[in-house]
């Protein structure tokens, strides 16, 4: 309890106690601590922030672009064909990769002279649109991949310069539990900021 000290007949001054200093410090630190907790929740539970280190997703995403992915998207929804996803690289899980989902669980991906065909679980074959791939980046790669359950086949849009499901050594697929999030938005550079598809 603070003592009241008379200074003049008309005024009183309260002596400062250690308790009021502690309270003042806590009042100062509380908003900072709350802001840090909110930032940690946003970063590790809701959003993933990434800088694109290579040109493997040209022309959709440029080298050096900064993107935000939703960590919640694949917690509540299944990955879909053509999603751009961040995931743990199967050959070294300490690295994160960004690619486009091409083949879904149970499907067969057949690449003939750079054209991608997917045979669904219903037996129907479709040629995938590749209008997001520049004509000069359509390579002559050939290969057939049967996508296991709970796994996905992914490719970079810059197919001539992408280390993706076609070339990995550990496995050619990304398992469901290795996805970090769905890339939703490019926020840098500012002149190209916007939703990504």
Report the location of each language-model feature:
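Flexible, glycine/serine/threonine-rich loop segments and coil->beta-strand junctions
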Residues: 54-55
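Soluble "head" domains of membrane/secretory-pathway proteins
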Residues: 2-26, 41, 45, 50, ...
């Amino acid at each position: 309890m603070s003592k009241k000290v008379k200074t003049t007949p008309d005024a009183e001054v309260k002596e400062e106690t250690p308790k009021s200093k502690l309270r003042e410090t806590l009042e100062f630190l509380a908003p900072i601590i709350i802001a840090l907790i909110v930032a940690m929740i946003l970063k590790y539970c809701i959003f993933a922030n990434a800088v694109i280190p290579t040109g493997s997703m040209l022309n959709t995403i440029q080298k050096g672009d900064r993107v935000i992915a939703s960590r919640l998207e694949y917690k509540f929804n299944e990955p879909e064909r053509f999603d751009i996803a961040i995931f743990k690289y199967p050959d070294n899980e300490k690295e994160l990769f960004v690619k486009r989902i091409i083949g879904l669980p149970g499907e067969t991906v057949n690449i003939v002279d750079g054209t991608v065909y997917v045979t669904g679980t219903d037996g129907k074959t479709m040629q995938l649109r590749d209008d997001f791939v520049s004509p000069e980046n359509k390579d002559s790669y050939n290969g057939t991949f049967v996508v296991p359950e709970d796994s996905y086949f992914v490719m970079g849009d810059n197919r001539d310069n992408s280390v993706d499901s076609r070339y990995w050594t550990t496995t050619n697929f990304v398992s469901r539990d290795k996805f970090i999030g769905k890339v939703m938005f490019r926020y840098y550079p500012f002149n190209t900021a916007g939703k990504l598809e």
